[in-house]
Amino acid sequence: MIPEFLVVSCTLAALCHSVPLSLQTEQQKVLVVSFDGFRWDYLYKVPTPHFHYVMKNGVHVKQVTNVFITKTYPNHYTLVTGLFAENHGIVANDMFDPVLNKSFSLEHMNIYDSKFWEEATPLWITNQRAGHASGAAMWPGTDVKIHESYPTHYLPYNESVSFEDRVAKIIEWFTAKDPINLGFLYWEEPDDTGHDVGPDSPLMGPVISDIDHKLGYLIKMLKKAKLWNNINLIVTSDHGMTQCSKERVIELDQYLDKEHYTLIDHSPVAAILPKEGKFNEVYDALANAHPNLTVYKKEEIPERWHYKHSDRVQPIVAVADEGWYILQNKSDEFLLGNHGYDNALAEMHPIFLAHGPAFRKNFTKEAMNSTDLYSLVCHLLNVTALPHNGSFRNVQDLLSSAAPKAIPYTQSTTLPLGSAKPGEYEQEESYPYYIGISLGSLIAIVFFVVLIKHLIRSQMHTLQYMQVEVAQPLLQA
């Protein structure tokens, strides 16, 4: 007969081994949603019950400092790389690369040249290299072949595709036979309307309400698909918006001869490429031209913007004060709402909310950086982050789990010469790993207590038997 204590020992030992292992390998799901141009305080302009539902049952960060320039493509690429614009290479919506001798323009949609994107590696590729699957519904850059890869599933950009259809695809990919563990969902509003009418217009109210309804629809569909309680949903944006006025316009033609330069990017950060031999003339003419315009030589751009160490940043950069608009001449398009200004300005800051099994409940944090999102998502997915400019330590208090240990990274980087180095790389174990370790340790303690009690009882039983034997009289011969 197998001794009882041996059966108990083997059973408990198996449990100790299997429980943490199964928890450690549990695959987390992450869905990142971006509502383009959703300023941090839009949450309070009109009733937004679905946003507040997420806040009450999840986490909310009051102020998110994004990257300069505060435009769509630079900031969406920062969210998925953790890098400043000078490091990931997408420095504006409109760029010229003198090395490639090529232009990149969101306006003309010539954005599909892989070389513009390959100074960094976005999250979906890192996730797929780790053996997982990713899906993207219109997220900027996901329909570009980067490092010979696309997301596992993606929708080519088409603004006419409804939000509901985008959600349907995301749900389909998360519930497929071979499901994704990482999804990206993008919606163009409230940016489009914010440009047309300005963020201070009463016409923004219905747009914000509609986005709240769209978030409610997403939550409803996640619940219907039984994903709501086991998916980590992150709702964020790329930038805010500020109100402009035709009374606050800086017209470059008043100060510069248009034959002496090429205007690569426009308002509110004018990227100026002087014609050969005309640098000093252009700079001198513009340097003190307007009290609401600050003009920098490339090498004099403030370090805090992390913007000057890229070939795609032009020799002269002119930055308008908040609310001021740069036009080459009065015939150029003027927008009542704009962004791209100094990333220290609160009106440029986006939202950040999150809900899911990894996040705390009803928790509000004062501030974070958009570069921090990358390491947070890598942590949730338990994939190794590449060198980045963010900090997991800066956002780990959003999580309900124990904070992971950190070690310095050892990978080399391909950052431009003179660029700021990425912050300390943090090795992030997934939070189920720590739950598993805790439960495993608890079971091990219980096992040893049971084993010791069993051994004590066995010894006591043997001792009692011996005492009874001694008490019996010897047989008479």
UniProtKB/Swiss-Prot annotation:
CDD domains named in the record: Enpp
Residues that coordinate or bind Zn(2+) 2: 191, 195, 339
Residues given in the record as Zn(2+) 1 binding sites: 36, 72, 238-239
Compartments (UniProt record): Membrane
Record-linked SUPFAM superfamilies: Alkaline phosphatase-like
Function per UniProt: Can hydrolyze NAD but cannot hydrolyze nucleotide di- and triphosphates. May play a role in neuronal cell communication. Lacks nucleotide pyrophosphatase and lysopholipase D activity in vitro.
Name of the protein this chain belongs to: Ectonucleotide pyrophosphatase/phosphodiesterase family member 5
Species of origin: Rattus norvegicus (Rat)
Native organism taxonomy: Eukaryota, Metazoa, Chordata, Craniata, Vertebrata
